[in-house]
Amino acid sequence: MGDEKSLAHTRWNCKYHIVFAPKYRRQAFYGEKRRAVGSILRKLCEWKNVRILEAECCADHIHMLLEIPPKMSVSSFMGYLKGKSSLMLYEQFGDLKFKYRNREFWCRGYYVDTVGKNTAKIQDYIKHQLEEDKMGEQLSIPYPGSPFTGRK
């Protein structure tokens, strides 16, 4: 039971596996942008007292294992996280406004799952997610020619 936290009259252990992606599932996170989105998300979680247990920024989506206090709903936190990070990314990278209109950097939805006793398994899954994505890309068979004309 060592995972429990406490508020004034509450003992809690609320962990969530959250996955969200940029609009149009574009592969946007490489190099400097990958580091920037990581530091922005860390900063925003810190401001709301949300603890990041594990996180991975893949090329076209982000996995996070978070401890969100029960006084805050997951949907309100995700609205805050995606909204503020979008503004901060647009401020830092001016070229994003040409790819994404109306300052909407993230997809509208997200995936969330509660984490029970299998925290270690989900942490391991998130830790190795980037490697699995790369393996999936390598499994695709390159076609030497044009798929439409059949010529090389």
Curated annotation (Swiss-Prot):
Query: InterPro entries, per this entry?
Result: Transposase_17, Transposase_17_sf
Obligatory cofactor(s): Mg(2+)
Q: Which UniProt keywords apply?
A: DNA recombination, DNA-binding, Endonuclease, Hydrolase, Magnesium, Metal-binding, Nuclease, Transposable element, Transposition
Coiled-coil-forming residues are: none
| One Pfam family named in its UniProt record | Y1_Tnp
Where Mg(2+) is bound, by residue?
61, 63, 129
Looking up SUPFAM superfamilies in the UniProt record yields:
Transposase IS200-like
Q: Name one GO molecular function term.
A: metal ion binding
Q: What else is known?
A: Belongs to the IS200/IS605 insertion sequence (IS) element family.
Entries under NCBIfam families matching the protein = transpos_IS200
Name of the protein this chain belongs to:
Transposase for insertion sequence element IS200
In which organism is this protein found?
Answer: Salmonella typhimurium (strain LT2 / SGSC1412 / ATCC 700720)
